[in-house]
Amino acid sequence: MNEKKSFYVIGMSCAGCAANIQQALSERKGVIEARVNFAASDVIVEYNPTLVSDKDLQKTVQEAGYDLLLENETEPEQAEILQREAYDKLHRKTIGALLLSLPVFVIGMFFMHMPYGNWIMLGFTLPVLLVFGRDFFINAWRQLKHGHANMDTLVAVSTGVAFLFSLFNTLWPTYWTDRGLEAHIYYEAAAVIIALILLGRLLESRAKSNTSTAIRKLIGLQPKEVIRILEDGTEQVIPIKAVQPGDILLVKPGDKIPVDGSVTEGVSFVDESMITGEPVPVEKVTGTHVYTGTINQKGSFKFMAEKVGSETILAQIIKMVQEAQGSKAPVQQLVDRIAAIFVPAVIGIAALTFIGWMIAGGELAFTHALLTSVTVLVIACPCALGLATPTAIMVGIGKGAENNILIRDAQSLEQLCKVQAVVLDKTGTITEGKPVVTDIFWNPGIDLRHSMEVLLFMESRSEHPLADAVVLHLTEEGIKTNLKGEFNSLTGQGIQGMINGESYFVGNRRLLEMNGISRESKQAEQADACSLEGKTVVYFADSKQVLALIVIADRMKPGAVKAIERLQAEGIEVYMLTGDNRITARAVADSIGLKHFKAEVMPSDKADFVKELQQQGKIVAMAGDGINDSQALAQADVSIAMGKGSDIAIDVAKITLITSDLNAIPKAWALSKQTVAAIRQNLFWAFIYNLIDIPLAAGILYPCCGFLLNPMIAAAAMAFSSVSVVTNSLRIKAKKILFQFLNLNFQLLGNHSEV
């Protein structure tokens, strides 16, 4: 059986590194698929553990010039510690490089002919390259040994050439002056390029860390220590890792629930909003379930640990979000192929630029050839391309997780905004999925209290799902009964009882007709009116007359009307599928402003209906409970599972809405639209940046206006390109998931069609 694991990667500096690691792992025997996420500094590997081990994977990555943190070596906290240490190290190097490169820049630009100026610049430049910029050269050499090239290669070659040329001219300036030429010095270019690229990576690192805040928030929901109750009743504080299934744990007011389990003692209220999205605390008594990361309110209670570690709902959510953030949108596959050849192509362009200037550069051919080739190497930026898609995906999926929208992969996130039709299962999706009594019309002149007790006696013995709603309604009214009698279930009709020699009936109209019981005209009118509203009418009668009409309905979810309005306002066709008859289905459609519905649909017909819409050329999303609708969910282009708490069907659909609020669907659509827009913007600017700046760096404008781009300006532009891409992606975090509705001219009644 294949395994899928996520590993933290050490040593990546650009998108080219990610491409090299992905290629190395993909070529390893036993690896099914490898996906490297440069933005998250991790890799998700699906592999056959009988053919390749974690150590083998680590060795493969090490041979490519990088390293992996194995699963047993890294907890999320450890990876975060490493990221913090790397950031602090980069921060120190950046400050040092900026301080030392500043005097080099000032002398090189404004006091280039001052006495001993070249030697002073050499003294400041050496530590910039050999101390603060040494990792560029080490990584470039390591990549060269493995036959690869990356962003560090471009930096090392460009600054190395500029420095060595300047060093030669400092030591032997007469080589040029004897030939009537000036011995040009480019220490400022080498030093400032290193400093600016370090500054760019520092800003990029800070921005990238913000894309992972959703994961850090989820991880932070689990406490580090718990209180375990020993067999003798004493309390013991233990680390969360030591908790085993079967342990009895104590939760005090304000504590976070450490693992999933069931209450064994005590009563309290728990804030489960992070799981269910519902703001109202849930009462917990003996036997009820509690979930990791939820927050206890006022009371204390004990519970038995049932699911720990990776088995908890919180762990499943974290794993799903991590895998989704590491997944790749279809457009990223093209970007990966470009990134893999980008650095070699840039080196080739730089070489051609050098040769071209040497051939046609005139008196200053060598100087211009060196300057332009170095500028080409410096300005080219595969990082902007490599970060364009994954940063937007990470932020988008993280934003979804914060809004109770769990998105399983990048493809679903990208596809959702293209959806043209949304198919909703009525029960449990549009409605609460739990029938309730909305009205009881009692026949005047009867003994109301006795009749209610008889009704409770009969319904409390019935196994029909609607009977539970009647029992709940009567008990909430304070009705109790000690009546005794006979009880009989009548298939397809209802139930019959005998109490104190009197026959009573609860059921449908057919039950009345079979026993010769007629309805009064007013009762018939009430029943017909309720049926037209899509409600179910249950009759309660004795042997002579109808005692009451019990009206039962499956309540609409509070946000259903608004959610459907929002989707239809965006031009999305919304279809309701239901097993109800046409009259009931039409009434439901009218009540929520739905334009399209299909009645009398069997569960097996739902997938066929989705297929029909797809055959019409529509991109279809299906929303259901994730279990009964699994076939239709599998058929849909985008599958959405509605659920909450322990009912979350994470593995069923591509998108799982933890909250039961239907408004999460248009929210998810808006999030998809924002993310795809950010991806397109990022890719556009990344491609335009390279397409325009590389020719500029090569000196394409020199023949017409004498313009040559300074390598230092090129370094600043390169750093800015990466930072701007990440910053643009982070705009998704700042945006609220809002909707603009310009034409909300809905006719809630009569504006529908049956399909």
Show the residue positions of the predicted features.
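Conserved cytosolic catalytic headpiece of P-type ATPases
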Residues: M1, N37, G233, V282-H289, ...
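Flexible metal-binding regulatory segments at protein termini and peripheral loops
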Residues: M1-Y116, K217, D232-V237, A315, ...
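Conserved ATP-binding TGD loop and adjacent catalytic N/P-domain core of P-type ATPases
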Residues: N2, A19, I407, I499-G501, ...
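Conserved cytosolic catalytic loops of P-type ATPases
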Residues: K29-L51, K55, Y187, R216-E311, ...
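Actuator/coupling domain of P-type ATPases
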Residues: Q62-E80, N118-M121, T125-E225, K241-L249, ...
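Bilayer-spanning, highly hydrophobic alpha-helical transmembrane segments
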Residues: T94-V104, Q333-G361, T372-C381, G386-T391, ...
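Signature of the cytosolic headpiece of P-type E1-E2 ATPases
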Residues: S101, L466, T475-A587, M602
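Membrane-embedded alpha-helical bundles of multi-pass transporters
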Residues: F110-H113, K145, L164, K399, ...
